[in-house]
């Protein structure tokens, strides 16, 4: 009888613990579904960088002086190629243009992007419940970080809270939110 009561108590404790632990399993992160089309149409257009998370602040240091970043994702000149243009507004007001070329790796449903000229860098796309939001995981030589982007420069605060909660569960304890106090720099067409 004692063993049955003890087993029932342990079972109830386990249920209670699991209900309080809101962290999803890493495998439960939903990758963005892409079919085998040449470009991921829904992901093209303007995006604003909102926040980043990493195991350490050193992996987010590149964003220390950033006030805001606006990106434009466009289809590239070749199949399965994406052109990314950005302008970075630094905290001291300077506009810094950047551009990258991404290559979608082969395979139906694959969401892995490779950055041209940076063979060590891999980018995976994930969906989040935040309206107009997308989450990227960048992995390179000596760093890994999650980045939150949104179609709006000022998404609801719940989006940032959800992102921080999710990444914290994955042991990405360093967190950075861009201030977005200044006007975004205009995007260059070059």
Swiss-Prot record:
GO molecular function: antioxidant activity; lipid transporter activity; phospholipid binding
Ranges that cross the membrane: none
Secretion signal, residue range per the UniProt entry: 1-17
GO terms classed as biological process: cholesterol efflux; high-density lipoprotein particle assembly; high-density lipoprotein particle clearance; high-density lipoprotein particle remodeling; lipoprotein metabolic process; negative regulation of plasma lipoprotein oxidation; response to glucose; reverse cholesterol transport
Residues that coordinate or bind tetradecanoate: 138, 145
GO cellular component, one term: very-low-density lipoprotein particle
Keyword Transport: yes
Record keywords: Disulfide bond, HDL, Lipid transport, Secreted, Signal, Transport
Tissues and organs where the protein is expressed, per its UniProt entry: Expressed by the liver; secreted in plasma.
Similarity field: Belongs to the calycin superfamily. Lipocalin family. Highly divergent.
Function field: Probably involved in lipid transport. Can bind sphingosine-1-phosphate, myristic acid, palmitic acid and stearic acid, retinol, all-trans-retinoic acid and 9-cis-retinoic acid.
Subunit structure: Interacts with LRP2; LRP2 mediates APOM renal uptake and subsequent lysosomal degradation.
Protein name as annotated: Apolipoprotein M
Lineage of the species this protein comes from: Eukaryota, Metazoa, Chordata, Craniata, Vertebrata
């Amino acid at each position: 009888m004692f063993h049955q009561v003890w087993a029932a108590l342990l079972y109830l404790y386990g249920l209670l613990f699991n209900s309080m632990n809101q962290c999803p399993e890493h495998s439960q992160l939903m990758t963005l579904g892409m079919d085998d089309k040449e470009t991921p149409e829904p992901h093209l257009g303007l995006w604003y960088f909102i926040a980043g998370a990493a195991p350490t602040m050193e992996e987010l240091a590149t964003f220390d002086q950033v006030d805001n970043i606006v990106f434009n994702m466009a289809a590239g000149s070749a199949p399965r190629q994406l052109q990314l243009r950005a302008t970075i507004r630094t905290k001291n007001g300077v506009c810094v243009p950047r551009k990258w070329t991404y290559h979608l790796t082969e395979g139906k449903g694959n969401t892995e992007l490779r950055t041209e000229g940076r063979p060590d860098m891999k980018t995976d796309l994930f969906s989040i419940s935040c309206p107009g939001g997308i989450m990227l995981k960048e992995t390179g030589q000596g760093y890994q970080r999650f980045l939150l982007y949104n179609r709006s420069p000022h998404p609801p605060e719940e989006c940032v809270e959800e992102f921080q909660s999710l990444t914290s569960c994955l042991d990405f304890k360093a967190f950075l939110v861009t201030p977005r106090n200044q006007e975004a720099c205009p995007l260059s067409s070059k």
